[in-house]
Amino acid sequence: MALRWGIVSAGLISSDFTTMLRMLPRSEHQVVAVAARDLSRAKEFAKKHDIPKAYGSYEELAKDPDVEVAYIGTQHPQHKAAVLLCLTAGKAVLCEKPMGVNAAEVREMVAEARSRGLFFMEAIWTRFFPAVEALRSVLAQGTLGDLRVVRAEFGKNLTHVHRATDWAQAGGGLLDLGIYCLQFISMVFGGQKPEKISAVGRRHETGVDDTVTVILQYPGGVHGSFTCSISAQLSNTVSVSGTKGMAQLLDPCWSPTELVVKGEHKEFPLPPAPGKEFNFTNGMGMSYEAKHVRECLQKGLKESPVIPLVESELLADILEEVRKAIGITFPQDKH
C-alpha cells in the first residue's frame, strides 16, 4: 500500500520533499494534500506538484482522512503548533529538524505523540544516507580502533538569507546547521549524554548566534567538537578518529555521498532525479528518510530506531545548554 502524505507548509524544503516523493514509486508513496496559511500559495504548490488537494489552513489538512502521515516543513518556531495539531488529529508525523526551538517544546511534542501512540520522528535525513550507514558499519566493526574524537564543521555565508538572521524566527547557526554536527557526534557516541558541554560564540547583530564552537566531553574520556557559522565558509566535513585511523565524510557532510576510511575513498551516488531541480543540495537524498518512515509504519513502530525520540530530546537539551553558555535566547524561550 502506498503511504499517503500531507505536506504542511508550501516553502522551499516542502517543495524539495514533494519533488522527491513524486520520483518514488506511486505504489509506495503518494502526496494527497498540501496546506499553507495562504490558500493561493497552497493551490500554486498543488498545481506545480500535481497534488489533488490544497488547503488554506493546517487544521483542514490535519482533519483530512486521506492523510496518513504529515510532513512538517514550516520554520522551526511553527513546528510545535503544527505537530500538535496533526498528532491531535491522529496523524503520524515527520517533523523537520530542529524539532523545536528549545527542549520544552520538544518534550511537549514527544509526550503528545507517546500518549496518543502515534509515530513521530525528527527529519534528520542525514542519518539515512548510505555514506552515513557505511560509517556506522565501520564504527561497529572497530575499524578505527578505540575512538578518541569526532570533529564536525558546517558553515556558509547565509547572512543574505532572511530566516538565517531572523531572531523572531529563532534563526542563527546552531538550530539550522549546528544540529547536523551535533547529531553526528551523538550518533558516533551512541546517543549518550555528554558529561560536560562548553561553548564559545559570536552573536550576529540581529541577536542570533553567528559562529559557535562547542566541545562535548563524553563518558570514557572521548570527546567531540563542532563549529557552525552563518557568516563564514567552513570545511563542511566530519571526521571520526581512533587509535587505528580516521574516517571522514566529505563536503557536503549534511547530505554526504563520499566516505573516506583510512585514506580509501568510497562513493555513494544519489538516486537519479532526471530533469528535477531542488532548492537544497542533494535533495533527492530525502528519499532515504521517506523510505525509512514507510518501513517504520509498516512495522507498526511509534518511533525510529535510527533517530529515537529520546535522542531528539537530548539534542534539544544540548543545543539549549549551548545557547545558554553563549547568551543566546529566543522569543520562544520561557524566561
UniProtKB/Swiss-Prot annotation:
Pfam families membership:
GFO_IDH_MocA (PF01408), GFO_IDH_MocA_C3 (PF22725)
EC no. given is 1.3.1.20, 1.1.1.179
Q: Which reaction does it catalyse?
A: (1R,2R)-1,2-dihydrobenzene-1,2-diol + NADP(+) = catechol + NADPH + H(+); D-xylose + NADP(+) = D-xylono-1,5-lactone + NADPH + H(+)
Top-rank lineage group of the source organism: Eukaryota
The GO molecular function terms of this record are: D-xylose 1-dehydrogenase (NADP+) activity; nucleotide binding; trans-1,2-dihydrobenzene-1,2-diol dehydrogenase activity
Leading EC class: oxidoreductase
Q: What keywords is this UniProt entry annotated with?
A: NADP, Oxidoreductase
List site positions: May play an important role in coenzyme binding.
Y71, H79, K97
Which residue numbers mark the site May play an important role in catalytic activity?
A: Y180
> Does the entry feature the keyword Hydrolase, yes or no?
no
BP GO terms, sorted: D-xylose catabolic process
- For the site labelled May play an important role for the adaptation of the alcohol substrate into the binding site, the residues are D176
Per its UniProt record, what SUPFAM superfamilies does this chain match? Glyceraldehyde-3-phosphate dehydrogenase-like, C-terminal domain (SSF55347), NAD(P)-binding Rossmann-fold domains (SSF51735)
Annotated family: Belongs to the Gfo/Idh/MocA family.
Assembly notes: Homodimer.
Q: What is this protein called?
A: Trans-1,2-dihydrobenzene-1,2-diol dehydrogenase
Which gene is transcribed and translated to give this protein? DHDH
